[in-house]
From Swiss-Prot:
Pfam families: eRF1_1 (PF03463), eRF1_2 (PF03464), eRF1_3 (PF03465)
Essential cofactor(s): a divalent metal cation
Key words of the record: Cytoplasm, Metal-binding, Nucleus
Tissue/organ expression: Expressed constitutively in seedlings, buds, stems, leaves and roots.
Originating gene: PEL1
GO cellular component: cytoplasm; nucleus
UniProt similarity note: Belongs to the eukaryotic release factor 1 family. Pelota subfamily.
Protein name, entry field: Protein PELOTA 1
One record GO biological process: RNA surveillance
Family annotation (InterPro entries): eFR1_2_sf, eRF1_1_Pelota, eRF1_2, eRF1_3, Pelota/DOM34_N, Ribosomal_eL30-like_sf, Transl-rel_pelota
MF-aspect GO terms: metal ion binding
Amino acid sequence: MKIVRRDFVRNGPGSVKMVAEDSDDLWYAYNLIAVGDSVMAVTFRKVQREIPGGGRDSERVKLKLEVQVEEVDYDKDGSVLRIRGKNILENEHVKIGAFHTLELELKRPFVLRKEMWDSMALDTLKQASDPAASADLAVVLMQEGLAQIFLVGRSVTSSRARIETSIPRKHGPAIAGYESALKKFFENVLQAFVKHVDFSVVRCAVVASPGFTKDQFHRHLLLEAERRQLRPIIENKSRIILVHTNSGYRHSLGEVLHAPNVMNMIKDTKAAKEVKALNDFHNMLSTEPDRACYGPKHVEVANERMAIQTLLITDELFRNSDVKTRKKYVNLVESVKDSGGDAFIFSAMHVSGEQLAQLTGIAALLRFPLPELEDIEM
């Protein structure tokens, strides 16, 4: 996120002018913009005008509007953020109080005003503008006849391509048909790889599968790259990593992120620290269950007893339209940090955030055992 101008008071009012440069930035903006804030941006609106002879005509006019936010919608596939609210900026074409939907797109500046820049909003802003936080990976997740290409960013995991090819059985007289279908499948995956994997953006490309499919495709990829002189692949072949997974389906992305050779490539990033924290939580839950808890009630009680060493929480919980609920979670994060603990805020649109959401979206590693939590209803 490019921050053009900031003018606010911590825990007080103010505004920030910013430009979203990628889909991760739009996700950060989605988490920053809350109901009751105001957003100013250039937009287009169809307006009616009189024409000679008494008729009316309509045209799209470029306007600068500021709306008081009533609803925010994030369209991941279209890379656009839609903000609906009432106009609060005097304009000859749009009355004050009229409803309008602003569409925030990549590379288009906007100004966000808040009455209260709390610690969560400031943390989100800091992460959004930190280039070192990037963890872009390209992942080719495959099994025979199925391949999917994902881009895993700081906060958003997006699907870029899905390739399906019917492959006959390998045995008997069908063997020739098998080999030709497999070659065609690999060729389709190669085309998608060339189109969607940009080594100037991603740290590495992971090819993952059960069995030997990944090795066969990797061999095909490098041979064809040499034959066709595909320079981006030839020059970055050391950044193509192979990982074993149990399937070629999306849920196996978690296995990819936990693989040691992948962790090593992204070890200094926010995403890697979150994956490690989630790993540590699962390990603790299976080895010392009294030192791990999840669910709002259990985590709240653990915090009251100053027992939380590491808090894991999804950003979904901070987007609650009820100000009291948001404040409760903001205070929880601050309380854990004040008592010397760590707090990791997971994106609900990231693989690790999806896994945490299955555990209610909130969990904690404890400094000392709290066996009595078992008796408290979640």
